[in-house]
Regions:
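Conserved functional hotspot residues or short segments at active or partner-binding sites
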Residues: 35
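Short, well-ordered beta-to-alpha junction loops that form the rim of enzyme active sites
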Residues: 38-39
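Divalent-metal-activated hydrolytic enzyme cores
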Residues: 2-31, 42-115
Length: 115
């Protein structure tokens, strides 16, 4: 996953992400970008459990803010899942899709897809 960060959302981290994406797409001319998720993700668990902000590290707090649309998708589309492991799996998969949407927000990606 491209860290779930849309361009301009968090200084530093976003600049690094944007620079890496731009370099890969424009300079290296990569043909594919792989977005990965993983099981037993502590950040996904924190997102679903709505941990108190004071219990979280600053970077995790930032990540959870960016990933909040995943929580909304879970509420809307996955309310029928009650097993915590199934909910975590669904949220991890939705987070990868969210990362893909974010990747498409980068101008260099939009230009490449239009080619």
């Amino acid at each position: 996953m491209v860290s779930g960060l849309p361009p301009g959302s968090v200084a530093g981290d976003t600049n690094s992400t944007a620079a890496a994406i731009e370099f890969a797409v424009e300079t290296l001319r990569v043909s594919d970008i792989v977005i990965c998720g993983h099981s037993q993700c502590g950040a996904i668990t924190a997102l679903l459990d709505k941990k108190p902000v004071s219990d979280l590290t600053p970077h995790l707090r930032d990540w959870l803010k960016v990933a909040s649309p995943v929580l909304e998708t879970m509420k809307k589309d996955y309310a029928h899942l009650h097993d915590p492991a199934e909910r975590e799996t669904a949220a991890a998969e939705e987070n990868v899709l969210f990362g893909l949407d974010n990747l498409h927000s980068y101008p260099c990606i939009q230009e490449r897809l239009a080619d």
